[in-house]
Amino acid sequence: YKRQELTGEAYFQVEAEPERPFYVNTPNGLSVYVYGTQFNVTAYEDDNYIETVLEKGKVNVLPPGQKTITLLPGEQLVYDKQTRQVQKNKVDVYGKVAWKDGKLIFRNASLEEIIKRLERHFNVDIEFNNHLGKEYSYRATFRTETLTQILDYLAKSANLKWKILTPEQREDDTFTKTKIIVDLY
C-alpha cells in the first residue's frame, strides 16, 4: 500500500489500484482510505479541525477510535480535534477546491476565516485586530487579484485599515515573512 502523511492542505487525484491501496494520514490520527478518486484534505496544525471534501469517487475516513465513515461526491467530513466529534455535510465542493486553480471563493465567510486563508494563499503573516468585536460576512470570488487588491476590497465594505510592514533582513541574508497589520474599527 501507499501512505501519505499530511500537515497543511492538499488536493489528491488518485487512480484506483485495489492491490495497492492509498492512505492519507494526518498528525492527529485521522486517516483517509482512497479508492479511485479526487478529494481535498485540510489538516493544518493551528486549526482545531481536519476537513475532508470529496469531489469524485469514494473515500473512507477513519477518525481516531471511531467507525469508518464513507464519503460520496459532494460530501464533507469535519473532525474536531479537541472534542473528537465528527460532522458529515453536503457542501459546494468547487468552493473548497478552487484554491488549486488559484481562486479564492468565500461564501458567508467571516473576516477571521478570510484572513486565515489569505495568510496561507499568499504566505504572509496577518495580525488581525477587531477593536469593536464587529462581525462581517463576505461573499466574494478572487481569481487574479493581488493581496493588496483584496485588502482594498475588504476595506471598502467595512471600517478596515491595513498596512504592510517591511520584511527584515536576517544575519544570514534571508528575510522575515511579510507581516500585515489589519485593524477593524
Predicted ranges, named:
Residues K2-T83, Q87:
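Short, small/hydrophobic-biased targeting/export segments
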Residues R84-Y185:
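N-terminal export/assembly leaders
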